[in-house]
């Protein structure tokens, strides 16, 4: 059986934590930032955990991470 290929786009966007959860970055941080509040932009810098409903599909894309 051949090895499963890692989805390169997903590998650049997601990281696994030590406990097996998958971390992601927030969207809406690249442009049109003048209309967003300071607090909103600050909170968008923080990482987030992938939702439970998406976890299985994303884990398939990054099997060896």
Swiss-Prot record:
Organism of origin: Geotalea uraniireducens (strain Rf4)
Keyword entries, A-Z: Ribonucleoprotein, Ribosomal protein
Domain of life: Bacteria
A single GO molecular function term of this UniProt record: structural constituent of ribosome
Example of a GO cellular component annotation carried by this entry: ribonucleoprotein complex
Keyword Ribonucleoprotein: yes
Record-linked InterPro entries: Ribosomal_bL35, Ribosomal_bL35-like, Ribosomal_bL35_CS, Ribosomal_bL35_sf
Protein family: Belongs to the bacterial ribosomal protein bL35 family.
GO biological process: translation
The protein, known as: Large ribosomal subunit protein bL35
